């Protein structure tokens, strides 16, 4: 349990304190991927919502 907590803390610290993480831009050769990359963080939320819709369709068995 403590090891998992330490790993989560390390990951959070590395993402929160690296300023290049939030402001990084793609190279010009890959600029056409920008719209796809803007949508990618939403995809896991859609799968989460799909699970509820699926359970509602089968009446929460």
Swiss-Prot record:
<keyword id="KW-0934">Plastid</keyword>
<protein>
    <recommendedName>
        <fullName>Photosystem II reaction center protein K</fullName>
    </recommendedName>
</protein>
<feature type="transmembrane region" description="Helical">
    <location>
        <begin position="32"/>
        <end position="52"/>
    </location>
</feature>
<comment type="function">
    <text>One of the components of the core complex of photosystem II (PSII). PSII is a light-driven water:plastoquinone oxidoreductase that uses light energy to abstract electrons from H(2)O, generating O(2) and a proton gradient subsequently used for ATP formation. It consists of a core antenna complex that captures photons, and an electron transfer chain that converts photonic excitation into a charge separation.</text>
</comment>
<keyword id="KW-0793">Thylakoid</keyword>
<dbReference type="InterPro" id="IPR003687">
    <property type="entry name" value="PSII_PsbK"/>
</dbReference>
<dbReference type="GO" id="GO:0009539">
    <property type="term" value="C:photosystem II reaction center"/>
</dbReference>
<keyword id="KW-0674">Reaction center</keyword>
<comment type="subunit">
    <text>PSII is composed of 1 copy each of membrane proteins PsbA, PsbB, PsbC, PsbD, PsbE, PsbF, PsbH, PsbI, PsbJ, PsbK, PsbL, PsbM, PsbT, PsbX, PsbY, PsbZ, Psb30/Ycf12, at least 3 peripheral proteins of the oxygen-evolving complex and a large number of cofactors. It forms dimeric complexes.</text>
</comment>
<keyword id="KW-1133">Transmembrane helix</keyword>
<keyword id="KW-0812">Transmembrane</keyword>
<keyword id="KW-0602">Photosynthesis</keyword>
<comment type="similarity">
    <text>Belongs to the PsbK family.</text>
</comment>
<feature type="propeptide">
    <location>
        <begin position="1"/>
        <end position="24"/>
    </location>
</feature>
<keyword id="KW-0150">Chloroplast</keyword>
<dbReference type="Pfam" id="PF02533">
    <property type="entry name" value="PsbK"/>
</dbReference>
<dbReference type="GO" id="GO:0015979">
    <property type="term" value="P:photosynthesis"/>
</dbReference>
<keyword id="KW-0472">Membrane</keyword>
<keyword id="KW-0604">Photosystem II</keyword>
<dbReference type="GO" id="GO:0009535">
    <property type="term" value="C:chloroplast thylakoid membrane"/>
</dbReference>
<dbReference type="InterPro" id="IPR037270">
    <property type="entry name" value="PSII_PsbK_sf"/>
</dbReference>
């Amino acid at each position: 349990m403590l090891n998992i907590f330490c790993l989560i803390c390390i990951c959070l610290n590395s993402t929160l304190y690296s300023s290049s993480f939030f402001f990084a831009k793609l190279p010009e050769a890959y600029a056409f991927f920008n719209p796809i990359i803007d949508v990618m963080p939403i995809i896991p939320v859609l799968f989460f919502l799909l699970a509820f819709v699926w359970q509602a369709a089968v009446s929460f068995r």
